[in-house]
Design a protein with these regions (language model features):
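Active-site catalytic motif of lipid deacylating hydrolases and related acyltransferases
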Residues: 2-61
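Conserved alpha/beta-hydrolase "acid-adjacent" motif
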Residues: 17, 121-127
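Post-His helix in hydrolase/transferase enzymes
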Residues: 22, 126, 149-165
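Catalytic histidine neighborhood in serine/cysteine hydrolases
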Residues: 32, 133-149
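Conserved alpha/beta-hydrolase fold motif
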Residues: 65-66, 88
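Gly/Ala-rich beta-loop-alpha elbow adjacent to hydrolase catalytic centers
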Residues: 67-77
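A conserved short beta-strand
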Residues: 84-96
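Short beta-strand/loop motif that positions the catalytic acidic residue
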Residues: 108-109, 113-116, 120
């Protein structure tokens, strides 16, 4: 079986290799996967990021698994409309915001996990609740803010369980 292509989409003001992506990369490595993190810092428009991601993954080997935080969560879900994606793991995704082109998501995989903080003052948790309800996603709401910095160990556990669906490891 071909190894999955695992991609991290960072948020608007973030960099590719912050605390969350480093933690998820380590968990992915333990599962035998490599997490790649494209650099979107030169692209302010989220839909430019979507276009870039879709173009870069057109010929990706194996199943494609997209992960992302905030704007990166939106980018991952929006790109899934145009790609054959096996799974989405989204942290505080920026859904249903003004200025973002896509508000109706389709062609999404069955395996979707969404993590959001109750105290998020940047992206309202209601968007994650709405999205998760519409797409039957696993939803985890944690006592944390937008960055989810206090919840990285919990997110790591959730990500490990999420990846088990693709690696067969338990």
């Amino acid at each position: 079986m071909t190894q999955a292509t695992l991609i991290w989409c960072h948020g608007s003001l973030s960099q590719p290799w912050g605390d969350k992506s480093k933690a998820l990369s380590e968990i992915a490595a333990n599962a035998g996967l490599t997490l790649d993190a494209p650099d979107f810092q030169s692209m302010e428009n989220p839909d430019d990021r979507v276009e870039f991601l879709v173009e870069s993954l057109q010929d990706a080997p194996g199943p494609v698994i997209l992960t992302g935080s905030s704007m990166g969560g939106y980018v991952a879900a929006a790109a899934a409309k145009q790609l054959d994606v096996a799974g989405l793991f989204l942290l505080a995704p920026a859904f249903y915001l003004p200025g973002y082109a896509i508000h109706v998501f389709s062609n999404l995989p069955e395996t979707i996990s969404v993590v959001h903080g109750w105290q998020d003052d940047v992206v309202d948790v209601d968007g994650s609740i709405r999205f998760s309800k519409q797409h039957r996603a696993d939803l985890h709401i944690l006592p944390d803010g937008h960055r989810l910095s206090e919840s990285i160990p919990t997110i790591g556990t959730l990500f490990s369980h999420f990846l088990e669906k693709f690696t067969g490891q338990e």
